[in-house]
Amino acid sequence: AATMSSELTSLTALELSMAIKLKQASCVEVMQAYLARIHRYNHRYNAIVALADDDDLLSQAKLADGELAQGKYRGWMHGMPHAAKDLTAVKGMPFTSGSLMYKDRIADQDSAMVARIRDAGAIFIGKTNTPEFGLGSQSYNPIYGATGSAYNPELTSGGSSGGAGSGLGTQMLPVADGSDMMGSLRNPGAFNNVIGYRPSTNVMSGRDASQRPLSTSGPMGRNTADTIQFLKTIA
């Protein structure tokens, strides 16, 4: 079982997507594999925060398998686990922005980007860590603490999408979303040996680039193909 788990989590996002679509791996098996890896490593790296209940996530994965059995395929992320950066809203999940001001805030609706990821079939397992309000080239906040680099958890993962970068680099996530004003997608990519791509500010949907001309959301991936595919999902 351990071998199968590591094999599933080491697949690229596109390989994992195809394995699920062709029923070479069930959504439950994929969720079990990722949860096993998270429980084994996340306490050292602190990449994923506000992790949802295992039983609830496995129930959602079972429903996704049931949909596949009935010929209902939601999209390329069908049944894949995903954790959104804790600067964006996921309905029913903590939405702290890394600040004590919002430590008890629960999102009442999905952001536009999260809705697109959900429409592609993803199962939201938690959030990824960020500095308070995303302000910093590290990922520490007073609620969840600091996130460590995938290559040395004693060193910073970068920021502000450091939880996303570390989660990808440790293979606890297939792809990840982040945001960038002054390097917040790019430096976690470098610090964790993954790709953090900052799109032009007019690429992402559901936002008015004129209101925040320097900031934009964007994709992170373990390789170029995964990153491009995920950009197509969230743009």
Whereabouts are the PLM-identified features?
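Short glycine/serine-rich loop segments
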Residues: Q109-I234
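An N-terminal boundary/leader segment
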Residues: A1-Q60, Q70
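Short, well-ordered beta-strand elements within core beta-sheets of diverse protein domains
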Residues: E15-L22, M101-R105, S215-R222
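Immediate post-signal peptide segment of exported/extracytoplasmic ligand-binding proteins
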Residues: A64-P81, D226
